[in-house]
Amino acid sequence: ILQMLNINAVCKMLFLKMSSKAEILSTIIKNRRSIFPESYIQQEIPTNIIEQILESANYAPTHKLTQPWRFTVIRKEGKAKLGAELGRIYKETVPAEKFLQKKYDSFGQKTSQAEVIVAINIQFHEDKVPNWEEIAAVGCAVQNMALTAEALNVGAYWSSPPLIDHLGDFLGLAENEKCYGLFYMGYHNAEQREANRTPMADKVKWIEG
């Protein structure tokens, strides 16, 4: 009887532990928001925190284990170089009649406000899997990063301006690699916003027979 009681106690403890883990994960998922650079404060993100956020990306699902995510970490003086490069690309690619000085200036402002910027790159393996699967895998990897950042109280958001199509040389990308966005990060003072979501029941169909 004592042995059975012990087994029941262990099972109950395991259930409570698993329930707690699920609740913690659900809270992190539901609290995650895009936090923009204007809310960032000038506080350094330690290297080990950056590495922890990146490491979480490495456990995203990936068909045939191609692990297509490739990241370029940009910080310190590198941020100004990125801002200047984005400004240069904008100036060279936008028609003169559509050029906006405010838009041009915003690239340098955003990169300077962020503490760290991670270029999100994809390495394609067309001989192994379709490109869309690699894109989906990297999307999962970035979600892991966003959730880990939320858990560590680091603000983050994934920016994908059209200019990223021209960042290959700046980032030193190979022919089978492409930039799919910039992941801005920084400690912040933004207030928690309510999630703007319609009911999940409106987006699900069940087939049971």
Region spans (language model):
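N-terminal amphipathic, basic helical "cap/leader" segment at the start of enzyme domains
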Residues: F15-Q113, G209
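C-terminal helix-cap and adjacent tail motif
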Residues: S19-I28, F36, G181-G209
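Short, electropositive alpha-helical surface patch
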Residues: F170-Y180
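Small-aliphatic-rich amphipathic alpha-helix that forms the alpha element of a beta-alpha
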Residues: A57, V118, F124-F170
